[in-house]
């Protein structure tokens, strides 16, 4: 093992409000990774990776190219909110707005920039049994949100029938993605079904100010 791959002690300090996010050492990358679950997001100003596994959910990867500060979220829209409406008054739209604006706000708190932010999106596969529109609605929302807010999508890999494993490096904007065409178990699907059930009983938070 060379010195660049030795595990540092302790891991780099996370921002205070992300201390509950699971972080661990990835040997073949020589860095720590923050693993986010459905409903979570993570922003870092350290030399860290951010990873997740997506089924129907969406992840937006957002960073400031000049500083290498960035983050990623992992969310889906509530499926029983608004009767299928996809407008700014629906609870589904408000929840998606909340998920996106928290991520963007936190990146901007550290960089002070908005116009130069780089955005990439992933996920939205049709993997939940009997609900083929879930992924499509998530894709529709995130594209519309970014268009309305004036963000261009630098790259995307969305839709299809397979979950995706994502590893994001905010320092250079690279995303390593693997389509999981064969799953050893239903963990990804079960996790998203549980998250969907939680969303159906969760009151949508109020508006978020965008800095």
Swiss-Prot record:
Keyword Ion transport set for record: no
GO BP terms in the entry: chemotaxis
InterPro entries associated with the record: CheD-like_sf, Chemorcpt_Glu_NH3ase_CheD, Cytotoxic_necrot_fac-like_cat
Documented EC number(s): 3.5.1.44
Record GO terms (molecular function): protein-glutamine glutaminase activity
Pfam families: CheD
Keywords noted in UniProt: Chemotaxis, Hydrolase
Reaction it catalyzes: L-glutaminyl-[protein] + H2O = L-glutamyl-[protein] + NH4(+)
HAMAP family in the record: CheD (MF_01440)
Family stated for the protein in its record: Belongs to the CheD family.
Protein name listed in UniProt: Probable chemoreceptor glutamine deamidase CheD
Species, as recorded: Hahella chejuensis (strain KCTC 2396)
